[in-house]
Amino acid sequence: MPLQVKYLGLQPYESTWEAMQRFTNERTEHTPDELWVVEHPPVFTQGLNGQAKHLQAFALEQNIPIIQTDRGGQVTYHGPGQIIIYVLLDLKRAQLGVRDLVHRMEKAIIEFLCDLSISADARPDAPGVYVDGQKIASLGLKIRKQKSYHGLALNFDMDLTPFSWITPCGLEGIQMTQVSHFIQQPDQLASQTALIKALCHQLQPEIDS
């Protein structure tokens, strides 16, 4: 059953999160898996392991919402110019464990970046994708009854300043980077398509082949 891809454009975080929960609660064994491609207005989100100390006082003074979510991980920032893909899978049907899903998501991002001549890797101690030790993509998932939602966020061509007001993903001293630091005037729409293709190849290789 091929993955269904939905391009949602710029959407508020909370309503998108509610839609993911609703989709996951209502889906049946026959519901196709979906990938949602989206951007959000500026927002800080706290994962289930998030700590208040990772939000600096300056961040609290900004006119940016801070939302406690049900995904794994700690605090991060979303904003325009970031490619976000929410991964809504039936893990039992796909015969995927959570660690395998994370690994495949990371591998898809790494392969996509490699095609742009950006050398990236993953870390066993901190999920995500890194370029020369700087974080370029973050991952966070929620698994409910063997169904996944939330997903990945790739920094593409955005204002990274709000990341300096937090401790991203709880990683002290981590620096953030983005695709536009390595490529002049990158094409976001074309890159969304290429990243989706890489993700589909990793999640459904038998269909993609």
Swiss-Prot record:
It holds the Pfam family LplA-B_cat. It catalyses: octanoyl-[ACP] + L-lysyl-[protein] = N(6)-octanoyl-L-lysyl-[protein] + holo-[ACP] + H(+). InterPro entries: aa-tRNA-synth_II/BPL/LPL, BPL_LPL_catalytic, Octanoyltransferase, Octanoyltransferase_CS. The active site is at C169 (acyl-thioester intermediate). It is found in: Cytoplasm. Pathway: Protein modification; protein lipoylation via endogenous pathway; protein N(6)-(lipoyl)lysine from octanoyl-[acyl-carrier-protein]: step 1/2. Keywords: Acyltransferase, Cytoplasm, Transferase. Residues 29-209 form the BPL/LPL catalytic domain. Its EC number is 2.3.1.181. Disulfide bonds: none annotated. GO terms for cellular component: cytoplasm. In the reaction, the free carboxyl group of octanoic acid is attached via an amide linkage to the epsilon-amino group of a specific lysine residue of lipoyl domains of lipoate-dependent enzymes. Belongs to the LipB family. Catalyzes the transfer of endogenously produced octanoic acid from octanoyl-acyl-carrier-protein onto the lipoyl domains of lipoate-dependent enzymes. Lipoyl-ACP can also act as a substrate although octanoyl-ACP is likely to be the physiological substrate. This is Octanoyltransferase.
